[in-house]
Amino acid sequence: MSLEIVILAAGQGTRMRSALPKVLHPVAGNSMLGHVIHSARQLDPQRIHVVIGHGADVVRERLAADDLNFVLQDKQLGTGHATAQAVPFITADTVLILYGDVPLIEVETLQRLLKHVVPGQMGLLTVELDDPTGYGRIVRNADGKVAAIVEHKDASEAQRAITEGNTGILAVPANKLADWMSRLSNNNAQGEYYLTDVIEMAVSDGLLVATEQPHDPMEVQGANDRKQLAELERHYQLREGRRLMAQGVTLRDPARFDVRGEVSVGRDVLIDINVILEGRVIIEDDVVIGPNCVIKDSTLRKGAVIKANSHIDGAVMGEGSDAGPFARLRPGTVMGARAHVGNFVELKNAKMGDDAKAGHLAYLGDAVIGARSNIGAGAITCNYDGANKYQTTIGEDVFIGSNNSLIAPVTIGDGSNTAAGSTINQDVDKSQLAVARARQRNIDGWKRPVKIKKT
C-alpha cells in the first residue's frame, strides 16, 4: 500500500493574536506543524503535501524540505476545500489527512488507523469526550456503524448529546477521495466545504467507515489560543517525563522538567528540578544533573555530573567528568574522563584531557589542555585579536597560576608552571617555570591622595 499524507495548515489563528501563523507557534521547541511533519515522516509516505494559506511564505521558508509539497489555498473555504487543493498532486493508493495544529498525535495511533484502509473500507479517528462542545458528532445507525458526521453548529439537540467526537483525521482510498472532493457542497450554516461530508458519501457509496480512538484524548487536541497552546506544552512535557522515567531516569519533579528536542537516556540517571533539555541530547548511565541547568545538543558520558545552574551547549562531557555549579560549556568543548570544571568557568571550543582541572573563575577559549593539567583561578586564554582567533596549547601536567593571561597563539610545554599574575605571550618549553610580571616595588613615604572639596 503506497501512502501520501495531506497536512492542513492554512488557518490564520486569529485567537492567537499574533503575526506568526498559527501552525508555527512552538510546542517543546518545535512548531506545531513541525511536530506533525515529524510524525508523518515516521510513517514512510511517498510524499507529504502541506496545504498553506495565511502566512504561506513564512511557513514555506521555515519548513522547506525535499519531501514536502506546499500547496496554496488562496481562500479559506473550509477543510474540504483545503483538501481538494492537494488532490491533483496525489498518486498513491492511500491518503492520510492530518492537521498542522494538532501536534501531539502519536505515530502508533496513526498506524492503527491506516490498517483500516482495505478494499471497501476507510478509517476515521474519533474520540470520546466529557465535553464535546465544538466537535463534530459521530452519528451511528441502529447497527452501531458510522452513518455521518454533523458539525456542532449544524447539530440538533439530540445530536449534540453525542459524546463521540470527530478528530478530522482520516485515512481513505485516494481514488475515492478525488471523487468525493468533486461532490462537496457548501450548503451549511458556515457556508464552507466540510471534509466531514465525505463520511456520508462513503456510507452512500457502500464503504464501511471503521473507527479508531487515541489512547489519550490530548493526542488530538488542537490549539486555537495561547491557553490551549500552554496546555499542549504541559501535556507534552509530562508525556516525555513518563517516557524517560520508564527508561530508567529519576525525575525529582516531572512537572518541573522540559524536553525541547530529542533525548536518549541510559539507566540510573538523576535529573533535578527546572532542567531544560534542548536539541539532540545523549545522556549515558549514572549521569546526575543538578537543578536549573540547560543542556543543548550535548553528550554526557557515563557518570558525568552537572551541578546547579550550569549551561551546557554543543559539548561532550567525558566519563566521570563534572561541571559547575554555574559552569558554561560552549560549542566545540570536549571534556576528558574525570575532567573538572568548577564554578564560573567558561569553555569554548576547548579540549580538556583526562583528569584536567579548571576549578573556578576562568575563561578557556580555543584551547587544548593536556591530561592532569591544572588551570588556576582567574586564568584567561586571550584568543581574539579583534579580527582573528588563535589557539592556546597547554601540555600535560601543566600548572597555570592564578590570574594568568595566556596570549594566543602560545604553547605551554608538558610539566611547565606559570607564576601567578603572569601574562604569557611566548612559548614555554617543557618543565620550565615562566614568570612574566613586573617586579614589586615598595615605596617609602608615599602619601595617599586627599579628596578635593567641591566648590
Swiss-Prot record:
A Pfam family the protein falls into: NTP_transf_3
Cystine crosslinks: none
Cofactor: Mg(2+)
Entries under InterPro entries matching the protein: Bifunctional_GlmU (IPR005882), GlmU-like (IPR050065), GlmU_C_LbH (IPR038009), Hexapep (IPR001451), MobA-like_NTP_Trfase (IPR025877), Nucleotide-diphossugar_trans (IPR029044), Trimer_LpxA-like_sf (IPR011004)
Localization per record: Cytoplasm
UniProt KW keywords: Acyltransferase, Cell shape, Cell wall biogenesis/degradation, Cytoplasm, Magnesium, Metal-binding, Multifunctional enzyme, Nucleotidyltransferase, Peptidoglycan synthesis, Repeat, Transferase
Name of this chain's protein: Bifunctional protein GlmU
Organism: Pseudomonas fluorescens (strain SBW25)
